[in-house]
Amino acid sequence: MYMRKLILALILGIATANGATAQTRSDLRDSLSAAVQVLAFHPDSLELRMKKAAWNIELEQWRYAQEEYDFVLRCDEKNIAALFYRAYVNERQGRYKFARLDYENLLRIVPGHFEAMLGLALLNQKDNRPTEAFNQINTLVAQHPNNAVAYAARGGIEIERKM
């Protein structure tokens, strides 16, 4: 039941974040300010912290987003959304080892998670680990043979490696 609520919150957060792309940066900052004010009264609200982190990402405030995901993961170390997005934030900050750890922890919780496997493969390519990247992307293609994104990612890695 808790996991369903978490997934619903994740979907709602993503929908909110996707809808926010049409907003101006000023509107995003206003939403973020409102979230900060509400957080002052409900500092333990993980859902609100996840939303705040999503707005931080939209505004490219990587450090603030990371702090929110750190808080969520201290309270719920198996929060799938927080692990995934913190990995993304760490990657954007150039903290590849931390991003790799988050993707690997996520894959321990949800083996075969498509986005985490893809993120890890692309991270390894970016971090000059070509053998690991290619092995991981091939595993991804083998596990998801009907997924065009997996093939496109493998094609991108092959082009970068001049294969």
Kindly label every feature range from the protein language model.
Residues L46-E47, I80-A81, F114-E115, A148-V149:
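Helix-start (N-cap) detector for alpha-helical repeat units in TPR-like alpha-solenoids
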Residues E58, R92-Q93, K126-D127, I159-R161:
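Register position in tetratricopeptide repeats
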